[in-house]
Amino acid sequence: KSGETLFKTQSVSKLIAQIAMHKQETVNKIYDPAAGSGSLLLQAKKHFDNHIIEEGFFGQEINHTTYNLARMNMFLHNVNYDKFNIKLGNTLLDPHFGEDRPFDAIVSNPPYSVKWIGSDDTTLINDERFAPAGVLAPKSKADFAFVLHALNYLSSKGRAAIVCFPGIFYRGGAEQKIRQYLVDNNYVETVISLAPNLFFGTSISVNILVLSKHKTEGKTQFIDASKLFKSETNTNVLTDAHIEQIMTLFDTKED
């Protein structure tokens, strides 16, 4: 079962890695704030020869077992121990790598709609990651806290590609205010809607949110890739041809 899960996300991981690294001849380092077993970071390694990622791979993971797995995974894929730095802890409340900022490439599939302390911790609204938006992600849905965290860690030339549930794009309240902040500051480069059933344990169609700090036009690109999939037993997959199609569109900046 777990092997199937891994395979299922492989194609999406490939797409995320390509987006984050798109047209960057070199990136200083690549970071995943919710690293899991390290699969997104390793997918980036697979796609780009080592020399392009100059200072290596960084990630933080909250679950002890998964954190150990991520470190083992790095060794198994021949990433030299001085080329990766995976830390254990809660990214939202106890973030590591502040001194390693900024990152040229950020990839992430953070947990969907998890609870967090949010406004119950009065210091968080003054945290440099969350303060600019003027409001915290709701306590019942930390999704945008991960997004704002990633944005804060992103370099001016870089790009972040984050897997998100569709709800964060249309719900009101604090999430609406955070969306407004992101759009007003021209940080949202592209939103890609993917086909259903591409992702572990959920048949929901997820989206990829692409953040950038170097947009020259005040436009956001929307790509509807919901019809791009190949049906396999119990699951859908993105083929390399589909990924190429999405990347071509992404490059043109057409909707």
What do the predicted segments below correspond to?
Residues 3-108, 113-115, 120-124, 129-134, ...:
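Conserved S-adenosyl-L-methionine
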Residues 100-255:
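A conserved structural/catalytic subdomain of Rossmann-like adenosyl-cofactor enzymes
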